[in-house]
Amino acid sequence: MARDVLIEIGLEELPARFIDDAELQLYTKTKQWLEENRISSENVISYSTPRRLAVFVKNMAEKQSSIEEDVKGPALKIAKDEDGNWTKAAQGFTKGQGLTTDDIVVREVKGISYIYVTKHIEGRPIQELLPEFKSIIESITFGKNMRWGSETIRYARPIRWLVAMMGNEVIPFEIAHVATNNVTYGHRFLGEEVTIQEPAEYEKTLKDNYVIVKAKDRETLIVEQLSKLEREHGFEIPVDQELLEEVRNLVEFPTAFVGKFEEAYLEIPPEVLITSMKEHQRYFPVHKKGVLQPYFVGVRNGDNYHIETVAKGNEKVLRARLADAEFFYNEDLHQSIDFFQEKLTKVVFQEKLGTYSDKVERMKQIADRISEKLSLESDDRKIIERAAEISKFDLMTSMVNEFTELQGIIGEKYANHFGENSATSQAIKEHYQPKHAKDDLPQTVIGSVVSVADKLDTIAGCIAVGLVPTGSQDPYGLRRQASAILRILHNEKWNLTVEELIDIALDVFQKSNVTIMEKTNEELIEFFRLRAVYLMKDKGLEVDVIHAVTDQKLGNVFVSFEKAKELSDKRNDETFKPIQEALVRVLNLSNKVETNELIREDKLETESEKILYTRYLDIKETYEKQLLHNETKQALATLAQLAAPIHAFFDNNMVMADDLEIRNNRLALIQALTSLILPYADLRKIEWKQQF
């Protein structure tokens, strides 16, 4: 007979950011434990609130499944003596398995005969196994742990109660001097201590005590309440999914309420108000026809009793926040950009890389060199120079000091206020983009250039002085910034290689008297290459194709992506296989070529090598122009024209001919062909055969 099982871990309030992952761990580890222990069940459901993590297993079998297990013994030559009798080794083996020599069978493994027995393993009663569940609870990991009292266990928050039940029976075990029972606790203020009669009653029992244990149910309830408020008040309440998930993990029984603030605060930039509401107070901002309104929606952890009082209390808290923001805003606007720029000279960016003022000066030089490479118009270059020059001034403002997440956004607002060109102001905002993998890219070429210059300065500078990310440690966010640069290069389709960018940055650092460590150039190239590999994998491209186009040289990021896509498509084209094989024949031989000889037409001896050389000359200029203009599809098609002549050449000629001049001439031809193929991709790295 199957029975339901419930495990609940009662805790002091967990940080919201830990809850989803902890619940997932509990669910996954439970499923894994059931599978490993051969325990059947109908379903597994996990729960989480700020004060509890729980898992419910429906219709868990009362006994493990019994199995028949084959056990390998010694080799037959050891198990039997010369007379064919079982030796002590065989007898000891079977006895150890609780069997006799009558149960032995012989099987051959890799040409050697071994003795085997089939052992019946009876399933254990579930009551014997369930106390092992303690190890699952103890194995849950969190972003940060703590100890409490004299306990040795480390956990996100102290464990205050444990529920462990199979049917109406308590499963006995203890963690941190807390013993399991069938008693749980409702809402901290509205609920009470309650005894669970059966695991299946868990959800209802807690709901009756003002706890909604399913996170998704709380989320749905919040969304429904927001929709109701929209209808009642004519509001628009944009639902930020990240904020919604955080709020649902802050409450056990959500009740939404409307608060308001003075309209005068709407004079403050809306980004400041929204940040204050969302990031600091976890409120949902309210709009009408896309315009921010002097209202907000909060979510209470409780019912609607005295909800008006709750709203007023929250209004008071927000009012204090907004009063501070208004003060900072007005104070900042009484200053000037030069005032804030001067402060940058006193703030260290990195000990070996100087102040923020030093960084800005390098950014200007890097941005100007990039602009030159891109042949940008003179007016755009002037805007880029100014944007780079004042890109960091807002870091010194009171507003950004209070709302650090608004750096760039405040820079744009203030730059406009202080009379800067709108393109300059926009670039100040955009140069921080993208801040993360899902963030928007800069919308203008000016913003893109300044963004790349900023991030390139940070990456090259840190690696130049030995601050290379290791493992999960990346305090300067270099990996994220490298990915951001690659995304911008791909999006803008600039005819600019990563190697050229690195050369620009290191040249600027050398002229700025920054001591650069040995092999910095190589480390930077490899650092960017690994980020490109990561991004290409994220786009669903195969690893071997990625390495084929990036291992030689990362080069132009957009072109590398396009080549990888083209080669990935060709993997599924049967007609491309002989083309790939021909090009690889050339590359395989090129490893053995050590010659700087030029091809001599008078030493082309056979018809097939003359045809190959002629075809090489025919396509060379066209192919190189196609690569130069990033025409990857056409370039590969042009390269494919060499396939038939290459096969004929290898089939009809001995490359390593006895005649040294003939040999060197053929090797020179191989080198020339290699110099065409490798700039596209090292096709040797692609495992084509697995596709056909």
Swiss-Prot record:
Highest taxon in the source lineage: Bacteria
UniProt GO cellular component terms? cytosol
Q: Which GO terms describe its biological process?
A: arginyl-tRNA aminoacylation; glycyl-tRNA aminoacylation
Which Pfam family is an annotated match for this chain, by its short name? Answer: tRNA_synt_2f
Provide the E.C. number(s) assigned to this enzyme: 6.1.1.14
Q: Which reaction does it catalyse?
A: tRNA(Gly) + glycine + ATP = glycyl-tRNA(Gly) + AMP + diphosphate
InterPro entries assigned to the protein according to its UniProt record, in alphabetical order: DALR_anticod-bd, Gly-tRNA-synth_bsu, Gly-tRNA-synth_heterodimer
Subcellular location, principal: cytoplasm
SUPFAM superfamilies, alphabetized: HD-domain/PDEase-like (SSF109604)
User: What are the protein's GO molecular function terms?
Assistant: arginine-tRNA ligase activity; ATP binding; glycine-tRNA ligase activity
The signal peptide here is none
UniProt subcellular location = Cytoplasm
User: Which UniProt key words apply to this protein?
Assistant: Aminoacyl-tRNA synthetase, ATP-binding, Cytoplasm, Ligase, Nucleotide-binding, Protein biosynthesis
> Where does the record place a coiled coil?
none
Q: Does the keyword Membrane apply?
A: no
Q: Which family does it belong to?
A: Belongs to the class-II aminoacyl-tRNA synthetase family.
Oligomer status and interactors = Tetramer of two alpha and two beta subunits.
Official protein name in the record: Glycine--tRNA ligase beta subunit
**Species, as recorded:** Oceanobacillus iheyensis (strain DSM 14371 / CIP 107618 / JCM 11309 / KCTC 3954 / HTE831)
Q: Which gene encodes it?
A: glyS
